[in-house]
Swiss-Prot record:
A GO term from the CC aspect: periplasmic space
InterPro entries for this protein: Sulphate/thiosulphate-bd_CS, Sulphate/thiosulphate_BS, Thiosulph/SO4-bd
Family the entry assigns: Belongs to the prokaryotic sulfate-binding protein family.
CDD domains the UniProt entry points to: PBP2_CysP
UniProt protein name: Sulfate-binding protein
Extent of the signal sequence: 1-40
Keyword RNA-binding: no
A Pfam family assignment: SBP_bac_11
Induction: By sulfur deprivation.
Domain of life: Bacteria
Function, in words: This protein specifically binds sulfate and is involved in its transmembrane transport.
GO biological process terms on file: sulfate transmembrane transport
Location of this chain's protein in the cell: Periplasm
C-alpha cells in the first residue's frame, strides 16, 4: 500500500540518518584562517545530530550573510550530522568541532569532562544553552486501532510497544523519563512511578538497541506504538507522509543544547565567529527556522505566531531539571542498579 510504503520510507531513512555520520561542506576551500581578520575566509565546523540538518541548511546561510555584512569576512561551514551519542564520541576522539549542538545536555557534559569544553558553558550563552524544545510522541499504526492517546494507554493489555534501550539510546532516555515524570510531576510518588513505568515496559516485548532498530520493528507491523520525537513526525508530515501520532498532555521537554568547543576554537582561531554563530541560534530568525522543521522554539518570543500554532498545548511540561538535572538523573535512572534496572527486574518477574 502506498501510504504504508511512504511511512516506512521516511521513518527508516530518518532512523538511518541518526545512525550514520554524514559530513557535508557548505562551501569549498581549505581551512586555516583566523576569525580575527576581516579579509580572509574563516571555517567553522558544526557537529550536530541528524534531525537538525534541515534547520541548519536554512540558518547557516542567514548567519553567513549577517557575518559578512558586519565584518566583511566570508564564513564557511563544515557540517557533520549523525546520532548524538556517536557524534559525542567522535568529538572526544578527535573530530575537531568548533560548535556542538546535540540531543542531550549529558552528551555535552561528556565533552566537557574530556577537557574540551570549559565548565560553565551553559551560563556563557542565553537560555542555559538550550536552543530547541520537543516532546515525546506516541506513533501508532494507521488509524490508531488501539486507541492510543496518553501514557496510561500504553499499559493496556495487548498493546505492543517498541522503544530502544535507554542504556544504549539517548532518545530512549527521554521516553523513559517522560513516562516516569507523567507520574511524579502530577503528584505521584517514586514507588507509583516505578509501578506505572513497569506496567508500560511489560508491553515492550524486546528493547531495541537504537532508533533504527525500533523503527524497523514498527514499520514491519510488529508493534502498535513507537515512541518518537514530535519534531521528527512534523517533519515527516511536511514531506507529505501520513503519520498517525498522539502527544501526551503531560510530557517532558526534550531540550537540545549547544556549546562552543573551547579547545578547538582556540586551536583554529575561530572563537569570535563560533561564539557569534551560537548567539545567532537564539535569535527569532534562527528560532523560526527550527520551528519550521518541527521543533518547538526554546525562545518563542519574536517568532511568528503562525509557526507556533500547529503545536498541541502541553498541560504539564516538565524538564530534566525538575527531575534533579542530568548529573543526578543519569546515575539514578540509567546507572547500574538505577530505576531502569529496577523496572527491568520487575518486568522479568512479571
Amino acid at each position: 500500500m502506498k501510504t504504508a510504503w511512504t511511512r516506512r520510507s521516511f521513518l527508516q531513512s530518518a532512523a538511518l540518518a541518526t545512525a550514520t555520520v554524514i559530513t557535508i561542506a557548505a562551501c569549498g576551500g581549505n581551512n586555516q584562517s583566523s576569525s580575527g581578520g576581516s579579509g580572509q575566509p574563516v571555517e567553522v565546523t558544526l557537529v550536530s545530530y541528524a534531525v537538525t540538518q534541515a534547520a541548519y541548511e536554512q540558518i547557516i546561510p542567514k548567519f553567513a550573510a549577517q557575518w559578512k555584512e558586519k565584518t566583511g569576512q566570508e564564513v564557511r561551514f563544515n557540517q557533520s550530522y549523525g546520532g548524538s551519542g556517536s557524534q559525542t564520541r567522535a568529538v572526544i576522539d578527535g573530530l575537531e568541532a568548533d560548535v556542538v549542538a546535540l540531543a542531550l545536555e549529558s552528551d555535552i557534559n561528556q565533552i566537557e569532562k574530556a577537557g574540551l569544553i570549559q565548565p560553565g558553558w551553559q551560563q556563557r550563552v542565553p537560555n542555559n544553552g538550550i536552543i530547541t524544545n520537543s516532546v515525546v510522541a506516541l506513533v501508532t499504526q494507521e488509524g490508531n486501532p488501539k486507541g492510543i492517546k496518553d501514557w496510561t494507554d500504553l499499559t493496556k493489555p495487548g498493546v505492543r510497544i517498541v522503544t530502544a534501550n535507554p542504556k544504549t539510546s539517548g532518545g530512549a532516555r527521554w521516553n523513559f523519563l517522560g513516562a516516569w515524570g507523567s507520574v511524579t510531576q502530577t503528584g505521584g510518588t517514586e514507588e507509583q512511578a516505578l509501578q506505572f513505568t513497569t506496567d508500560i515496559y511489560k508491553n515492550v516485548p524486546i528493547l531495541a538497541k537504537d532508533a533504527r532498530e525500533s523503527t524497523d520493528v514498527f514499520t514491519k507491523g510488529q508493534a502498535d506504538v513507537l515512541l518518537n520525537y514530535e519534531n521528527e513526525l512534523i517533519l515527516a508530515q511536511q514531506k507529505g507522509e501520513k503519520v498517525d501520532y498522539a502527544i501526551p498532555p503531560v510530557n517532558i521537554n526534550i531540550q537540545g543544547p549547544v556549546a562552543v568547543v573551547d579547545t578547538y576554537t582556540d586551536k583554529h582561531g575561530t572563537r569570535k565567529v563560533s561564539e557569534a554563530f551560537v548567539q545567532f541560534l537564539f535569535t527569532p530568525e534562527a528560532q523560526a527556522e527550527f520551528a519550521k522543521v518541527g521543533f518547538r522554539p526554546a525562545l518563542p518570543e519574536g517568532v511568528d505566531p503562525q509557526l507556533l500554532a500547529p503545536f498541541p498545548k502541553i498541560q504539564t511540561w516538565f524538564t530534566v531539571a525538575d527531575l534533579g538535572g542530568w548529573a543526578k538523573v543519569q546515575p539514578e535512572f540509567f546507572g547500574d542498579g538505577g530505576w531502569f534496572d529496577k523496572v527491568q527486574q520487575a518486568v522479568a518477574g512479571r
